[in-house]
Structure formats: structure tokens, C-alpha cells
Amino acid sequence: MATFFLEVLTPDRKFFSGEAECVIFKSSDGEMGVLAKHAPTVSAVSVGPLRINAQGKWIEAVVTEGFAKIMPDKVVILTDTAEYPEEIDINRAKAAKQRAEERLQKKLSQLEYMRSKTALARAMARLSATNRRR
């Protein structure tokens, strides 16, 4: 299968850099899969799973909001955070989920509501990734 160069970058680190056969992430329009020779485009990246097929193996991760620049021979994903399932503290993710759910039960401003929804989505994506690992 044809490959392309993939970089997944966060403000803290170069999360992934190398050849990939496929990358799948959640975008604002739903799940997006990219193969080599994809038409050039820019896409928003939403909170959720990131799956990379590199050297015939699938690598699972969780990313938060960001952007993907897609070119025929290269994809660059810039995201606030990216984590492998083994890096996720399950207890911390459960506590974050509970806090976000409690905040959503209160009367909130529109901004606070959106922040709480994002926090809940992030916590749920992190927990989902750890559940898939087991």
C-alpha cells in the first residue's frame, strides 16, 4: 500500500513522525480517513480517537482540537494534546468526566457550557481509549 509522511504535533512534543499508510481522525464533519495521494485540503480536528496505520500496525491515540493539513504526500496534524492510551491516568479522566457532568447540571453562561461540553468530550474520549486498550 502507498504511504505518505505523517506528523502529529502538539505544543509540547512531536507526537508522531514517520511514514503511514492511513490516518483516521474525527473532524467537524465526522470521521475522516486519509490515504496517500489524498486531494489537498485543510480540516478541523475534533476531540476523539486518532488511528494511524504505520508499517502494517494500527496505532491508537486520543487527540483534542486542532487542524489537519492534508497534501498528496504529507499530512500534518496540529492538535492541543495527543496521548497514547497507556499515558492516560484513568482515575484522573474519570474525575474530569464527573466534574464536567456536574458543571453541565448547573446554570451556565454559553461560554461555560461550551467549555464543559468540551471537557466532557475530552474525558470520555480518554476513557474510551483506555477501555479499547484492555
From Swiss-Prot:
Q: What keyword terms does UniProt attach to this protein?
A: ATP synthesis, Cell membrane, CF(1), Hydrogen ion transport, Ion transport, Membrane, Transport
**Single GO molecular function:** proton-transporting ATP synthase activity, rotational mechanism
Q: Please give, as recorded in its UniProt entry, the membrane topology of this protein.
A: Peripheral membrane protein
Note the InterPro entries from the entry. ATP_F1_dsu/esu_C_sf, ATP_synth_F1_dsu/esu, ATP_synth_F1_dsu/esu_N, ATP_synth_F1_esu_C, ATPsynth_dsu/esu_N
Looking at the UniProt record for this protein, which Gene Ontology cellular component terms does it annotate, in alphabetical order? plasma membrane; proton-transporting ATP synthase complex
Q: Which domain of life is it from?
A: Bacteria
Kindly list the places in or outside the cell where this protein is found, as annotated in its UniProt entry. Cell membrane
Where does it mainly reside? membrane
A Pfam family per the record: ATP-synt_DE_N
Which family would the database say this protein is a member of? Belongs to the ATPase epsilon chain family.
Subunit text: F-type ATPases have 2 components, CF(1) - the catalytic core - and CF(0) - the membrane proton channel. CF(1) has five subunits: alpha(3), beta(3), gamma(1), delta(1), epsilon(1). CF(0) has three main subunits: a, b and c.
Q: What does this protein do?
A: Produces ATP from ADP in the presence of a proton gradient across the membrane.
Q: What is this protein called?
A: ATP synthase epsilon chain
Provide the species name: Ruminiclostridium cellulolyticum (strain ATCC 35319 / DSM 5812 / JCM 6584 / H10)
Q: Which gene encodes it?
A: atpC
